[in-house]
Amino acid sequence: MEKNLYDLMDWAGIEEIVYSEAANPDGLLGPHVTESGLLIQAYIPTAEKLAVKLKRTGKEYPMELMDEAGFFAALIPSKTMASYSLLVTYDNGMSEEILDPYSFGSCYTDGDIKKFESGIHYGIFEKMGAHPMKVGDAEGVYFSVWAPCAMRVSVVGDFNLWDGRRHQMRRLGDSGIFELFIPGLKAGIIYKYEIKNSNGDPMLKSDPYGNYCELRPSNASVVWDISQFQWSDQEWLEKRAKTNSKEQPVSIYEVHLGSWLRKEAELDETGAAVNGSEFYNYREIAVKLAEYIKDMGYTHIELLPVMEHPFDGSWGYQVTGYYAPTSRYGTPDDFMFFMDYMHKQEIGVILDWVPAHFPRDSFGLADFDGTCVYEHKDPRQGAHPHWGTLIYNYGRPGVRNFLIANALFWVEKYHADGIRMDAVASMLYLDYGKELGEWVPNIYGGHENLEAMDFLKHLNSVFKGRKDGAVVIAEESTAWPKVTADVREDGLGFDYKWNMGWMNDFIDYIHYDPYFRKHHYGELTFSMLYAYSEDFVLVFSHDEVVHGKGSMLGKMPGDTLEAKAANLRAAYGFMMGHPGKKLLFMGQEFGQLHEWDENKSLDWEVLEHPLHSLTKDYVKALNHLYKSQPALYQYDYDPDGFEWVECTDSKDSIVGFLRKTKKNEETLLFICNFDTMTHEKYMVGVPFAGKYKEILNSDSQAFGGEGRVNSRVKTSKKKEADERQDSIEIKVAPLSIMVFSCTPEEEKPAVKKAAVKKAEAEKTKAARPSVKKLRRKRLKRKKQRQKSLQRKKQRRKSLQRKKQRWKSRQ
């Protein structure tokens, strides 16, 4: 061994690397310029012989074995850095030429690290995770992970025989970030991180930022390049950015991709089902689902979580791979096709997202580097006793950054139109689901989670700032105020909130036998007292058809399926008329008999029965009516868009209301009868004189009803009803919803009235002589009278002269 080379050895550092306990292995490994020359060191445990080959000259320099564990070194006569490769001969006789991972610099800037440490690196997913890339002339995969308390982190996989000594990662100062570029690797390889905790115990972890995962029950991460897909939905995205969704129709079909439609599982040579063969690929299901959605008239779909999760029974709500679409249905490119195809069919896609908790699986986020990286250490703060899951530490910048960037990731990389945030109430309350002594109050002694509040405001502010039309929806089940209010007004900043209060009250009401509903009339009308306190979405979600709750049809009262179906039609019709956007879980549109089971397909076979096929037709008609009538969506969040007509008829269990816009001719009248009584001549007050045409009736035979409809247009009469001067008389079928279009009585235009007045004036003028003519006539008559008087005077004088002459003769 050369003395110069021996003197350059850091034997303590070599021991750290050999025992794989070095937090910063590139302090030794790779090229280092010294006074004696260019020192190159490498550690390959299974290597028998190594040599350095300079790229510029092709000259080879044998490396000396400095530690029999596989640590080699060579001193090259050069005072500057030089590009090189390593010629490796393994102990099994095989040899290869590789590039040294430790000859490549960091991909992080100081700005990247500073932003991450502040929790504001919203594009951190471009750094963290595994990224196929080219560095200089070298192609390979760049790995990065955050493990702040780890002694050492390595990338392991088939490519290095899962040996954690081979590719030990570089630690970037005190940031807790580890990174390494491994040349020669390609997309498709599986990998994990081997993390040594502070006690020196190794753990295998999936990549928290990994873009793809193995199919369960395997759980390794898979390298994938998500930048290669060719999108064709630019027109959709541009239109979305310019559109205010609150003034547009939003009717959402909630879907679990794994059970909406399934295939017969394939069998292997032993007769066992092939894992995952029961699922349709993202590409296959995209075509089938889009065709169904368009026919049914929905505007959006909402997917139960597609992020990777190990347990089918969690429905996706116990996520381990937040940055990876589940491999159950295909690759990331397949899911991109799904999203792109939906947009080309003008269908929006909302993704369920779970920032409230995560599972304890040993390969996941729990105890990530041997410490509580993502969760709280104190179980009173960091665990859900009922769910058995862990709670995020929202006060830690790296955790906030992980979650906020993840929400943005699905919008930016997969073009999601929005996210629906699950279990927000569990985030906001420190005592959620806990008994006294099981939780820790905040600094003010209250039960509000101040850190979660700040996190939600932060996330929603970032989304608002993008101005791309993507929305954030909260599933918040309490009366927490200002969920959808602006952050500047001390709100949480969500775009929409699920109206759980309406759902619970209405389901409680509708499940009563119609005879008893008159005693619960307030549950039907109560929601309008707070309808404008938030921007609500009305939901009949998956939560209402599981855990023994039965299907929506099963909740309805009635001795026969026909009676249940009539109640269900009334429920759906009332929901469509009530202010707020709409959501319905799959299978409930055709009245599925059984509650939802994630392990099998929906009961599509029931559509062979007219009751179910006609129920499906009814929901289809409701959706198309909804989209065609601006009154049903333009003023969802403006009190001017709704007006009660009848909200006191508890005896008959009837309510009536108007949905309105600024245009009278777009007004709709809803009459809802939740009783079993028929009313042949029911008087209804109307907003103005005009014609009222029934455009939908849930009792129509086309929807499975008895056909007790109002087939003729109703002309209003000047007869007071419901404190209105105009009214109509209609037939009200039992358990039915009627919708009437309202056409105001036509008034003669003001221009025509003026024309009539002018014509009458001209006619009068023509019939009467002019003033000048009258004056001439009067003057003529005056002259005639004067002449007549003169003649009379002359005759008198003549007569007097004659009398005088006669007297003189006498």
Predicted regions and their residues:
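Carbohydrate-interacting/catalytic domains
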Residues: M1-Q248, A273, R283-I293, E562-A565, ...
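Short glycine-biased active-site loop of nucleotidyltransferases that positions the nucleotide triphosphate
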Residues: E64-L65, R170, F311-G316, R360-D367, ...
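Substrate-binding/active-site clefts of carbohydrate-active enzymes
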Residues: C213-E214, Q234-E247, H256-E448
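Conserved alpha/beta catalytic core and glycan-binding cleft of carbohydrate-active enzymes
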Residues: H415-D417, Y432-N599, V606, K627-V684, ...
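Arginine-selective low-complexity/disordered segments
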Residues: V771, R775-R776, R781, R785-R791, ...
